[in-house]
């Protein structure tokens, strides 16, 4: 069962971790926190919807926090890592009203945009967290429970010296495989060829998963990041990996 870290540690936010003597702990993160200034439209969306659909970091740090407790019902759970401005989140969640969707995004203007999209679409099955995705998968998601995981256009960390910060690694693949329900899918997309190659190498090597490169997922809308990649001349790669075992 997932467990929170001991009292006094802010586990969901590695950039806040301290050593025993109070010094800031250096962590290898899979994300970077970009600017947090809101546009007037984003500020309006945040004011209107954040209290309803965004889970504060301090709430996630509470030892009694659960993802199920974020919703007013019991439903199959989907997690999206790196939801950006919510284009995929809202479209895919709207098509799955019987599922609950937790979108993890640390960029607050993107969260605000997503909140606005949720409100405009009239959805009630999406919640947003702005905490570390790797920690969240390990400590908030129950084993064998996820109905699906979506990871579209994760930060490519394209410089070789930064590859260690990429999200899709062997250890993360093993973690995800153990959190997916049997038969559940992990959908990924990237516009960086070398990251796509790394994803295939890592995920093919995980014995609990099966899959590979697939045709573009028709349900996934063309997002801002995808358009940017196409404009730069980069090919888009979609991948789908399934947790081995009979679907429930």
From Swiss-Prot:
InterPro entries: SAM-dependent_MTases_sf, tRNA_(Gua-N-7)_MeTrfase_Trmb, tRNA_methyltr_TrmB_bact. S-adenosyl-L-methionine binds at residues 80, 105, 132, 155. Pathway: tRNA modification; N(7)-methylguanine-tRNA biosynthesis. This is tRNA (guanine-N(7)-)-methyltransferase. Catalyzes the formation of N(7)-methylguanine at position 46 (m7G46) in tRNA. It comes from the Bacteria. The active site is at 155. Keywords: Methyltransferase, S-adenosyl-L-methionine, Transferase, tRNA processing. GO terms for cellular component: tRNA methyltransferase complex. GO terms for molecular function: tRNA (guanine(46)-N7)-methyltransferase activity. Pfam families: Methyltransf_4 (PF02390). The keyword Transferase applies. The keyword Transferase applies. Belongs to the class I-like SAM-binding methyltransferase superfamily. TrmB family. The gene is trmB. Substrate binds at residues 159, 191, 223-226. It catalyses: guanosine(46) in tRNA + S-adenosyl-L-methionine = N(7)-methylguanosine(46) in tRNA + S-adenosyl-L-homocysteine.
